């Protein structure tokens, strides 16, 4: 799993799950929102 340089999207290679958390502008630890297959966007800080 990896976080992109802008810190807004997480991606994992198995297509089933969102990654746990990543660094985002809206908080150091953000909850990933389920988006498209294999992609997550960071949501509000949990």
From Swiss-Prot:
Any one GO MF annotation of this record: toxin activity
Function: Insecticidal toxin. It inhibits insect voltage-gated sodium channels (Nav) by partially blocking the channel pore in DUM neurons from the American cockroach, not by acting as a gating modifier. The inhibition is only partially reversible after prolonged washout. In vivo, the toxin causes flaccid paralysis followed by death when injected into Heliothis virescens larvae. It also causes uncoordinated movements followed by full paralysis to sheep blowflies (Lucilia cuprina).
Annotated GO CC locations: extracellular region
Location in or out of the cell: Secreted
UniProt tissue specificity: Expressed by the venom gland.
InterPro entries for this protein: Insecticidal_knottin-like_sf (IPR053718), Toxin_28 (IPR012633)
Disulfide bridge positions per record: 3-19, 10-22, 18-42, 24-40
Protein name (record): Mu-segestritoxin-Sf1d
Keywords annotated in UniProt: Disulfide bond, Knottin, Secreted, Toxin
Chain segments carrying region Keys region for toxin activity: 31-33
Organism: Segestria florentina (Tube-web spider)
Domain-related comment: The presence of a 'disulfide through disulfide knot' structurally defines this protein as a knottin.
A family per Pfam: Toxin_28
UniProt family annotation: Belongs to the neurotoxin 16 (SFI) family.
Entry keyword annotation includes Disulfide bond: yes
